[in-house]
Amino acid sequence: MNKPTPAIVSQDAARRLPRWALLLFCLAYAVPGLVGRAPWKSADLASFGYMLEMARGQTSWMDPRLLGLRPEADGLLPYWLGAAAIRLGDGWLAPAMAARLPFFVLLGLAMAATWYAVYLLARKPQAQPVAFAFGGEARPSDYARAIADGGLLALIACLGLAQLAHEITTSVAQLAFTALAFYGAAGIGRRRWWPEIGLLLGLAGLALSGAPTISAFLGAGAAVLHVLATARPWRKGDWRVLGIIALATLLAILLSSSMDLWRWRILLPQDAGSKDWRTILRLLVWFTWPAWPLVMWSLWRWRLQVWSRTPSLHVALPLWFMLVTLVAALTTKPADRALLLALPAMATVAAFALPTLTRSVAALIDWFTLLFFTGCGAIIWIIWIAMQTGYPRQGASNVQRQAPDFVASFSLPVFLVALVATLVWGWLVHWRVGRHRAAIWKSMVLPAGGAALCWLLLMSLWMPLLDYVRSYSVVVRNVMAIAHPAQCIQQWGLSREQVAAFAYHGGYRISQATPDQLECPWLVVNPEALAGLQVQASAGQWQLLATLRRPSDKGDDVMLLRRTSP
């Protein structure tokens, strides 16, 4: 027996967001950060370094290494995608741009899979709104489409999605395959086979992207929930659903075993002190904003469906995906990259809060969003004006302090793009307060629009500054002014991203220094490893020419030494 639904939605409220508007939302969010920037510290640049080495044939595709160092993240599939794109784009695309293209597709896949997952869950009978006595309630397909629109907007609105989703790391691949597996689990058992294919590819891709344990738990939990959610779970059709989920999960486990992907990364209780729980709490609050307040509201309003003997999949399934990834964030490092995988499920649960919101709560969301993102956009513009003109003086001095040698430049196309985006934000605010008050996705328009606006402004107006402070290009250029890339140069103690930066920005073919092999006239050293070098080699053989520092990081120095004696 279905529990009473808290959703009361008229047909007028189930109007869909125009497809062109939804597509523009997605493009305005996904494209900025794709073009016009260098690889950034640290995971983004390190991953790119491995992809570049693989594409150039300098390392094995099955065991990639940078000067003998394996990637910190397990799972080779993202590296294969990036390296293949670099090789295919050789001669007509810059390597950094080519490497980003498959990850741009993966971000689009995550968005599309989330929309379809919400749509399929909203089509389930337990998720449907109350039927009116004299008709006029929302039609199932229209209601599901409106809820899916709200779910996708909620995903775009999440603050934590912006930077991590625009990197070329395993995290983006894990996000896409988690969303794909979520879509498959939500729609499995329908007449078409697309959800089954999505589940197989999602769980397998998630395992091959370095998250085999999460993949196994998601698959096993989805199977259990499908059994619990069925009144008569042992019918022929339900056996088929259970078998497909079990097969997909088993395939992911076998792939993980064959690729030797199982690693113990759980922090045991005695290691709990290594995690700053206050930092984790702050991360949860801002990273998942504005989804988490809506998730709490949704779980309360749909509590009867959650705690029923036969739980409703439209809430229970995303709740399971959310719990698995939240536990991973709390028990592994880094927490933000594991928490990224929770966002599609959180956006789904948040979407089911939309038809239950009161006017006062919806108004609170709108006003807070309006003030927050308008303020953020204004700050971005003010700092940009300060970079261009020197006024306001406080803003200009802050930039000068963070990036002492940065010289701002004016670009008319960039200015026009930022101006148009700001005007569109003003139009969205006018639209929201003036019309279409009935649409159930209306409360997510300003959060998603504000997130897209601020990300676009950062990736346009602030891009030169961000490139200056977040890439290693300045350090490499300073080294190139002293040591030509064609000369023999070795390194001691450099990180993965630093080695990748020298290869990409300077074209250096750096070799690893060893205690009995300090044969090059030039040596690049991490200051923290200098003591070890002095033990292994005679310090009198080397002259320190320069200590070079990234502008925004006092603890990220590189020392350039030249041999003074044979």
Regions found by a protein language model. Name each.
Residues 101-139, 156-157, 180:
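Transmembrane-helix motifs of polytopic, lipid-linked glycan transferases
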Residues 160-173, 212-214:
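Short acidic/glycine- and proline-prone juxtamembrane loop motifs at membrane-interface regions
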Residues 114-117, 161, 181, 295, ...:
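Hydrophobic/aromatic residues in alpha-helical transmembrane segments
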Residues 3-23, 171, 187-566:
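Membrane-embedded architecture of ER/inner-membrane glycosylation machinery
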Residues 47-73, 77, 84-87:
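Extracytosolic helix-loop segments that constitute the early lumenal/periplasmic catalytic or substrate-binding loops
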Residues 76, 80, 89-117, 141-149, ...:
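Loop-to-helix entry region of an early transmembrane alpha helix in multi-pass inner-membrane enzymes
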Residues 135-154, 462:
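Intrinsically disordered, low-complexity acidic Ser/Thr-rich regulatory segments
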